[in-house]
Amino acid sequence: MDTRMRPSALGFVAVFAALSAFAVPATAQDLTGTLKKVKDTGSISLGHRESSLPFSYYDDNQKVVGYAYELCDKLADAVQAELKMDKLERKLVAVTSANRIPLLTSGGIDLECGSTTNNLERQKEVSFTLTHYVTATRFVSKKANNYKSLDDLKGKTIVSTAGTSNIKLVTGLNTERNLGMTIIPAKDHADAFLMVETDRAAAFAMDDILIASLVAVSKTPDAYVISEEALSVEPYGSMLRKDDPAFKKVIDDAMLAMFKDGTIEKLYDKWFMNPIPPKNVTLNVPISAQFKKVIANPTDSGDPKDYAD
């Protein structure tokens, strides 16, 4: 039997092979960056906070909960679906404001699920998801002291959390305005608030939603006041490794779908407008005009000007 193919048959085989190359889904060998790491290990490492209520924190049972954490869990579902994996282990890694970026860039975590401000300086080191919250830097103090503005804190001791954009901002304003404040870095938000609670600091400068949450679950919420003066606009996003476009596309596409189908509003309502652990306190913080703008026109911009009313 003559097993040689005619030229026309050879041409058909070549065309079929070429088309098949496009039709076959990507294999583990085709994957790069975080997607390859997740596929190879069967797990995704999620960096969470310990006391960033209501975004990412421990409840009374030491279970990680929160708005940003639940959002990240849904994003992990999207990664699992993209990679066609039957199961995907979530490895939970506690991070702080000071170590979250080093842990991400070194591969210790794959996606950071906390309360991190997306700004142009951080974008030099990492990438961000689409913005999932917009807040502002303010300070909390004891109502009895009647501190209305940053200028009222001249010569006082101020605390902020180490490794945050807030402590850098307040340090800069302290110099610019010649306020002579003593600025102390705290390990985390809970420790910083405790310093105000115990009169070791006159005020705690941080994102308003975080300090509002700490006040709400404190022993005497009525004893504190949050400044009306806003020192900066702070858009939140979850961090992922820089220069990893395939992973970012999966994450961004999943978030776009949640913005479109109303999932993001449902998550927001759950964590900001209803009772939350550990004390079943309702924060009662409606969606801001800035965040409504983001939901309508999603962005990962780190420029505060893009979040103006």
Segments predicted by a language model, with ranges:
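Bilobed "Venus flytrap"/periplasmic-binding protein-like clamshell domains
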Residues: 45-54, 64-81, 117, 134-189, ...
